[in-house]
Design a protein with these regions (language model features):
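Catalytic beta/alpha-barrel core
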Residues: 1-2, 17-27, 43-55, 75-77
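Glycine/small-residue-rich loop that forms an oxyanion/phosphate-binding "nest" at active or ligand-binding sites
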Residues: 1-10
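Catalytic cores of alpha/beta
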Residues: 2-3, 25-40, 64-74, 80-99, ...
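Alpha-helix N-cap and loop-to-helix initiation/capping positions
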Residues: 2-3, 29-32, 52, 56-59, ...
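Hydrophobic pocket-lining residues that define ligand/cofactor binding sites across diverse proteins
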Residues: 11, 37, 143
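Glycine-rich phosphate-binding active-site loops on the catalytic face of alpha/beta enzymes
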Residues: 42-55, 92-113
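C-terminal helical cap(s) of enzyme catalytic domains, especially alpha/beta-barrels
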Residues: 58-67, 87-92, 106-144
Length: 144
């Protein structure tokens, strides 16, 4: 914790904002981890509420926002799209949100023999994520 606290202090000294990424979603006790992150002085925490997607973790995200009580920004992220963004923002009480608005694209890679290093469930070695302006615009529009 001391090393993390020092890192946050250095970032703040240089005028940077500090966001703790989704590591909190792996914590045994998310609310205790949230208190630890608040004590570090971070500005926000990106979370899916301990679930695969923020929609699935919506109840926990709302509770995190309640527990945080304005001491830190709870930023839902993970699986956010045009079909669920409004509900995620409303139910969680979040004022900020994170989403990729991406499509999975087949790689142009031709050589495909040998061992795959990425499980097929994650798209395999021969796909990549690419931001989609259309998906981003649809998701933003869905908040209005």
């Amino acid at each position: 914790m001391d090393a993390c606290r020092a890192m946050v202090a250095v970032a703040k000294h240089h005028g940077m904002s500090v966001t703790v990424h989704r590591a909190i979603d792996r914590a045994c006790n998310i609310m205790a981890a949230l208190e630890d992150i608040i004590s570090l002085g971070a500005d926000r925490v990106l979370s899916s509420g301990g679930q695969r997607t923020s929609y699935e973790g919506l109840e926990t995200l709302a509770k995190m926002n309640e527990v945080a009580a304005g001491r830190i920004i709870i930023m839902p992220g993970g699986g956010v799209n045009a079909g669920n963004i409004k509900e995620i923002l409303t139910v969680s009480g979040a004022g900020e949100i994170h989403f990729s608005g991406s499509d999975t694209i087949q790689s142009d890679m031709v050589y495909r023999e040998g061992v795959s290093f990425t499980p097929e469930i994650l798209g395999g070695d021969f796909t990549r994520s690419e931001s989609s302006v259309e998906k981003i615009m649809q998701t933003i529009q869905a908040t209005r």
